[in-house]
C-alpha cells in the first residue's frame, strides 16, 4: 500500500487515510475539515502561483485593485515606471488594512489608523510628524514596507506567489505549450471586459476546484438544459446524443493543470454542415476560428505561435480545463450566423474564504485587437453561459453547496469519492505537446491528477 507520513491531523488521521492512492478514492471529510483547511493555506496557497487579474485592469501609473490570495487581502498596483506589484494589504504598524477601496488610482496608500504611508511599490514613505520618528529606530525605513509577493505576467494575466523558490516556468511545466495557444496568440493579447463578477457560495474551495480538473462527464447530466435548448448539439430525449462531443484528448501535468482538447471538426458539425476533410490548417481556422479570433487576426496566430501550436488550434484545440489549484479555463466556441467571430473567454478563480465558503470570481476576456461589436458579443456570451447567473453556473452553484451540506454528516464523512473510471496514459500518433494524455471519452484521469498534485503539496511539511 502506498504511504506517506507527511501529514497527520490531531486525531491521528493521516493524508493517506483521506486520499487512498491504491483505490483512487478521496474521503468526503476533506471537504469539511477546519484543521485540514488551515494546512491548505500554508501548504497549497502559500506555495503556488495564484491568478489575481489582468494588466488591462490597471493600465495607468497609480492604478490599483484589491484582490485575495486565499484569505490574504492584497493590493495589486502599477508604479510610475509601469511595473506591477502585489503587496499584502496589512499595515506593519498595527495590522490595519492600508487600502480599503476595491479599485482606484493612488501613488501612495495611507493607513487610516495611524497614517503610515506606502508607495505604489509597497515601500514605506513615513508616518505623520516625521521629526518624532513614529516608526521608531529598531528597524530602518527600508524594512517597514508592505510584505510583497513575487509577480509574473503571463499573456497579461497577473500571477503572484509567496513562494521564493518556485519559478513560473516550473509551475506551468508542459502545460505551457497548450496555454500559450489560449493566452499568448495575438500581438496585443487579451483584455478584460470590465471588472470581474464575484459572488460567495457556501462550499469548500476544493469542490469546484477538483471539477475544474477537466471534469467533462458531468456536462451530460448536470448541464442537460444546454441540450434541451439545442446549445450542445444534442437532444433532450437522450443524453447519449451528445456523446460524440465528449470524445477528444484530455491531458494533465504533474503540477495539476489539466485541459480537454476537442476535435474542431466535431465542434464544427454542431454549427454547420461542412466537412473539414482535406482542408489546410489555415482553411480550417477560417472555417472555425478559435473563440474571439476574427479572420483578420488569424495571421497573428502564425506569427505568435509555433507551427505545431497553430496546427493544434486548427485541429484539436484546448477548450476547457484548469490551472492548479483554483482556476477554471473556459474557451467556448459560439460562431455567429453571419460567419463572424464570437465565443466566450472566461477564467474563474475559486478563492477560499473558510472551510465552508468560497468566493467565485469570473474574469471575462476578448482579444484586445478585436472589433468592439465582437467584444460586446463575447461579453454577452460569457455572462449568459459562464457568468454568475449563466446557464452553466446556475447548475454548478446549486450542486456544490449540496455536496458541502452532505460533508457535515457523521456517516457522510465515511463516504469516499470515486475516481476509478481511468483511461490510462496513451499518446496519440503524431501528438507533439507534452503531458500525460488520455484520448477517447472523458474519464476521471485528469481529476485524479488534480488530487495527486494536491496530495504532493500537502505531504510536504
Task: List PLM regions with ranges.
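Short N-terminal helix-initiation segments at or just after the protein's N-terminus
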Residues: 10-20, 96-103, 285-297
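Generic alpha-helix structural propensity
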Residues: 31-35, 47, 69, 86, ...
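Generic structural signal for secondary-structure transition and capping sites
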Residues: 45-49, 96, 217
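A short, Trp-centered hydrophobic/proline-enriched beta-strand micro-motif
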Residues: 47-53, 223
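Rieske [2Fe-2S] iron-sulfur-binding domain
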Residues: 57-177
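C-terminal catalytic domain of Rieske-type non-heme iron oxygenases
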Residues: 77, 83, 89, 149-461
Amino acid at each position: 500500500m502506498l504511504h506517506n507520513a507527511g501529514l497527520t491531523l490531531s486525531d491521528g488521521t493521516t493524508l493517506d487515510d483521506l486520499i487512498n492512492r491504491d483505490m483512487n478514492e478521496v474521503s468526503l471529510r476533506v471537504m469539511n475539515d477546519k484543521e485540514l483547511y488551515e494546512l491548505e493555506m500554508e501548504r497549497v496557497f502559500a506555495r503556488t502561483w495564484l491568478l489575481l487579474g489582468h494588466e488591462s485592469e490597471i493600465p495607468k501609473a497609480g492604478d490599483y485593485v484589491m484582490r485575495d490570495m486565499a484569505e490574504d487581502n492584497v493590493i495589486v498596483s502599477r508604479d510610475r515606471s509601469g511595473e506591477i506589484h502585489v503587496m499584502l494589504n496589512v499595515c506593519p504598524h498595527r495590522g490595519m488594512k492600508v487600502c480599503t477601496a476595491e479599485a482606484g488610482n493612488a501613488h501612495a496608500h495611507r493607513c487610516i489608523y495611524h497614517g503610515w504611508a506606502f508607495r505604489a511599490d509597497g515601500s514605506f514613505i513615513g508616518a505623520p510628524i516625521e521629526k518624532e520618528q513614529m516608526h521608531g529606530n529598531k528597524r530602518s525605513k527600508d524594512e517597514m514596507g508592505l510584505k510583497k509577493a513575487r509577480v509574473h505576467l503571463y499573456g497579461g494575466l497577473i500571477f503572484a506567489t509567496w513562494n521564493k523558490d518556485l519559478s513560473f516556468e516550473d509551475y506551468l511545466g508542459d502545460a505551457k505549450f497548450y496555454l500559450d495557444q489560449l493566452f499568448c496568440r495575438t500581438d496585443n493579447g487579451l483584455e478584460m471586459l470590465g471588472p470581474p463578477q464575484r459572488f460567495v457560495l457556501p462550499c469548500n474551495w476544493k469542490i469546484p476546484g477538483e471539477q475544474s480538473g477537466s471534469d467533462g462527464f458531468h456536462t451530460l447530466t448536470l448541464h442537460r438544459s444546454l441540450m434541451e435548448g439545442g446549445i450542445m448539439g444534442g437532444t433532450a430525449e437522450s443524453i447519449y446524443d451528445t456523446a460524440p462531443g465528449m470524445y477528444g484528448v484530455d491531458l494533465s501535468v504533474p503540477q495539476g493543470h489539466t485541459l480537454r482538447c476537442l476535435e474542431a471538426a466535431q465542434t464544427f458539425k454542431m454549427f454547420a454542415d461542412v466537412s473539414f476533410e482535406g482542408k489546410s490548417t489555415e482553411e480550417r481556422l477560417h472555417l472555425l476560428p478559435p473563440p474571439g479570433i476574427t479572420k483578420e487576426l488569424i495571421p497573428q496566430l502564425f506569427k505568435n505561435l509555433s507551427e505545431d501550436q497553430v496546427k493544434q488550434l486548427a485541429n484539436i484545440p484546448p477548450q476547457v480545463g484548469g490551472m492548479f489549484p483554483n482556476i477554471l479555463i473556459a474557451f467556448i466556441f459560439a460562431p455567429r450566423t453571419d460567419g463572424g467571430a464570437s465565443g466566450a473567454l472566461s477564467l474563474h478563480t475559486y478563492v477560499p474564504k473558510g472551510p465552508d465558503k468560497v468566493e467565485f470570481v469570473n474574469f471575462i476576456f476578448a482579444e484586445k485587437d478585436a472589433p468592439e461589436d465582437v467584444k460586446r458579443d463575447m461579453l454577452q456570451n460569457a455572462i449568459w453561459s459562464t457568468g454568475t447567473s449563466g446557464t452553466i453556473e446556475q447548475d454548478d452553484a446549486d450542486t456544490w453547496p449540496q455536496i458541502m451540506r452532505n460533508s457535515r454528516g457523521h456517516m457522510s464523512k465515511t463516504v469516499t469519492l470515486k475516481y476509478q473510471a481511468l483511461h490510462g496514459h496513451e499518446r496519440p500518433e503524431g501528438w507533439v505537446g507534452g503531458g500525460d494524455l488520455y484520448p477517447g471519452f472523458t474519464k476521471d484521469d485528469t481529476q485524479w491528477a488534480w488530487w495527486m498534485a494536491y496530495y504532493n503539496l500537502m505531504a510536504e511539511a
